[in-house]
Amino acid sequence: MKTSKVMTAKEAVSKFVGDGMTIGVGGFFHAISYVITHEIIRQQKRHLTICQPSFNEHADQMIGAGCVDRIVSSYVWMEVFGPLHCFRRAMEKGIPHKIEMEDYTNFAVMARYLAGALGIPYIPINSMKGSDMMNYSAWMGENKVKLVQDPFGSGKEYAAVPALTPDLGYFHVQRADEEGNCQMWGIWGDSPWSMRACKEVIVSCEEIVSRDIIGRDPNRTILPGYKVVAVVEAPFGAHPKHTQGYYDVDRDFIFKYIRESQTQEGWQKFMDEWVYGVEDRVGYLKKYVDTYGMKKFLDLKASDMSSSSVNYGF
């Protein structure tokens, strides 16, 4: 019997995100779920460990809001847009409180997720060998990474990293059905493996479609519904990042955040206006249109570049 998992972001976060959880965050600049991130902040979840190969300002906002105690990642930065100031304040000054970061390479975090998704306890990699990352650990100690010999006799040595299996994951996709079968195209990043490694997953999507539409294009299904506990329909749910086929990156808005968050007071003003001051994503988008105008909003929408159709018959 089909079971609908559709609910609001508020309901999903309230029901499935608990204090002290280890949370996997999907997306790689593309299709990052700000609708869930902002709801976690509004509900004041605490003592979270957040995991992602590379973090952007979604992590910075959770850190500034006091949600995060620990990070598993390779960096927390905003690419060409500049540094993330809440992360630096927390690491350097303990504002709002001190946080810890277990520092891996980008690939090593991905490999840990891969091991978790495959159900194996660890995975050997070439990454990290010979670097200071082998010598430093925030809280995992000797269990962060270990050198292992090739058991098949080559004599080669590898860095073995443990499987990463977060309590919960969340990510954003273009479309999903009511049962949680998720389809994504464009930059996948870590999402196919990180979300499989998580024990449960909340998915936000641009639109909910029928099971028939999902079934007609199975190769785009990157996560099956049995992993998903909640489906949140949220158009523009990844703004200010992009979602391919729906809207582009809002560079001006990202620069605005980087600029205003340079001071604690500026960051608080931004958050009061764009996160705490709106009830949900609908309110967020309404405020955006009221502030910047409908033309600016519509200019973000993606141009049409449709893929060729394929024949699945046999």
Identify the function of each model-found stretch.
Residues 1-314:
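Conserved alpha/beta enzyme-core scaffold
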